[in-house]
Amino acid sequence: MQNIGYCGNHCTYCFFTACKGCRNEDVCYSYAALFDSKKCPNAVCCAAKGLIGCWECDNLEKCQIGFYCSGENDAKAYALFIKKYGHKTYTQTIEKLIAKGYDYPKQFKEISDIQEILNIFESEI
């Protein structure tokens, strides 16, 4: 799970190449760096609930914490995909999409519709 953020973003394919991910102590490039506490709200919430990631939460679809309140619909779509299909299928699907020419994650950040993102991912299963 080290390469998947609590919110569902996949660190291996992130365009912030210097970032070591939110599961690392060095948060200088991660979303956590935006907060005075240097802690991502999604990571804090997961830790408080004892969750590996937001995809384990029963409130995911309605959640407005962290990435999910900032219009990051791609992150929520990723978490919903992981919830339904698991993190291994998620990683494999990203690899298939990249091989087809998709620019992950940048291209998906431009899509505001969660279901549209899910449809693209599910078309590769």
Residue ranges and their predicted role:
Residues 1-125:
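Cysteine-centered metal-binding/redox modules
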